[in-house]
Amino acid sequence: MKQAREVALDALTACERQGAWSDGYLKKAIGGAKLDGRDAALATRLCFGVLQNRMLLDFYLSKLCATPLHKLEASIRNLLRLGAYQLLYLNRVPDHAAVSEAVSLARKKAKNPRAAGLVNGVLRSLIRQREAMEPPADLSTRYSHPQWLVDSFVARLGREEAEALLAADNGEPPTCAQVNTLKISAEELAAMLTAEGVAVEPHPWLPDCLFLNGTGSLEHLEAFQKGYFYIQDAAAHLAVLAAAPQPGWRVLDACAAPGGKSFAAAIAMENRGSVTSCDIHPHKLRLIEA
């Protein structure tokens, strides 16, 4: 049975090799591995943490690895990123255990029999040198954002405010739930989720939205199974608030996957009218249909 780190590794490798959508692949992999709530949360944190900081992780790893990262097997490249993220950002697992787990995965995943030794050497070097390693000077690498976006932020905001924005953008986002007010009120849902052991807070400026913590696997929550809420980032929900669709409207969601904005529009329209959901990527259309 796969554990959290292997699930995260498989998701990262699929994203790189196949262009898989990280959230959709990870959810499927977590379900297939039957991870409990704690391990599902760890796999999610590891996968998204690596994706969010990949340029910075590669910057550090490239200084420690004699072989250029792009010449490594995809699974080993992502395993190094995974191990580096764990050593630099997480402190729940002792360093020696993190390295040991990475080496075990390398033996299982790599085609090259020497890969396990490489993983062991690079990660142990990172442990020895991490306190002395200087962060990169350029903001793009330090915050793992594309250069064109950093240049745009700096031009508009100045370097200091742009850096603060980049740092905030790399913060761990809260889990934001959009309440399906066609079925339940925000207050009723909050009480139901609290009874299921979820920590709930009202969103400070979005109506009918809740911050959730300690959900474990959402599919196990009765409120989720009954369609009382779905997860949607606040920024995506703002698009629907700005459009302010009314009952009876015909709405076109031209960039719809995975479907959250279309759902929010249907709720705002009180299920009266029509919503046409489109996306240019066929694999994302399947997410909407699901």
Predicted regions and their residues:
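S-adenosylmethionine
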Residues: 1-290
